[in-house]
Amino acid sequence: MTDTTKNDKYNLKLIDSMQKEAPYDKVWNLAWHPNGEILATCANDKYIQIWSKDTNGKWGLVQSLEGHEKTVRRVAWSPCGRFLAGASFDASTSIWEKSKDELEFTHVSSLEGHTYEVKSVAWDSTGTLLATCSRDKSIWIWQMEDDNDFECLSINSGHGQDIKCVLWHPNEELLASSSYDDTIKFWKDIDGDWECINTLTGHESSIWDLAFNKDGDKLVSCGEDKLVLFWKFDKENEKWINIFKFKNENSRPIYSIDWSSLTNTIVTGSADDSIIFYEQESDDTPDKYKIILKKKNAHDSDVNCTKWNPKFKNILASCGDDGFIKIWELQDK
């Protein structure tokens, strides 16, 4: 494959691609296994699909997991890689257990309680807490028990519209959520009750995705308004503040954002079919950022998700409405 985008410092090389068959060829979301060698995806069918490399290094489909009555919108691996969660439009979240040494999966639990579509699911850094959010405007926080059962610890209502994304802080028991009400909220357990401790405003429309940096002191958000906003935790005042913004770099909504824990590079995927990379402007200006590479026509239609590999530097995966799952390498000259 020779598809490479270049600039003075970076190349973006397409390593491999896999295609879903029509009519179920809109790939919504993907998640890397913590070992960096397995991908889980979900599309406009009822399946969670597992992808891995064969003995020749070629990526391919190895398993399809069927446990939902409607499309699965988001997938998430537990930090240990043993469990996989899928959030579905059938208002449930499925939990799958991976066998120790094989790519075999067992359906171990189904989390029910939301009254409408579950839009997102996320594990905390310990793998014991799970958060789900829904079109019903609620966030449920679940605790995993020893027998693979889950107990609902809290049901939180604070957003005025559908909740699109939930994301745990990488080092603390702190949950972030974003919504169609144009806000980001932070939730924390205070004396046994999960409460909203901070609300961020700045977006002009629905906020589609969130990502923390490795240390958890910065957050990026993207949305329907084509904005990428950078937030920083102000320790002195104990609140999150907006420190930087990109506007009009995309011609259509930005659906996905991810912050690499290995390189500190940020990547976005947009409905304008592009993938854009950002990094810190300089060590002297830690709160300013710049675009380092823009890949136009990364997919033939909307780019729905972009995720950095957690183990291998500068490797990322993307998926889109064109039915393709692509593996890329951001090469530093």
UniProtKB/Swiss-Prot annotation:
Keywords: Repeat, WD repeat. GO terms for biological process: iron-sulfur cluster assembly; protein maturation. Pfam families: WD40. SMART domains: WD40. Belongs to the WD repeat CIA1 family. Essential component of the cytosolic iron-sulfur (Fe/S) protein assembly machinery. Required for the maturation of extramitochondrial Fe/S proteins. WD repeats lie at residues 22-61, 67-106, 113-152, 158-197, 202-241, 249-288, 298-333. GO terms for cellular component: cytosolic [4Fe-4S] assembly targeting complex. This is Probable cytosolic iron-sulfur protein assembly protein CIAO1 homolog. It comes from Dictyostelium discoideum. The keyword Repeat applies. Coiled coil: none annotated. InterPro entries: CIAO1/Cia1, G-protein_beta_WD-40_rep, WD40/YVTN_repeat-like_dom_sf, WD40_repeat_CS, WD40_repeat_dom_sf, WD40_rpt.
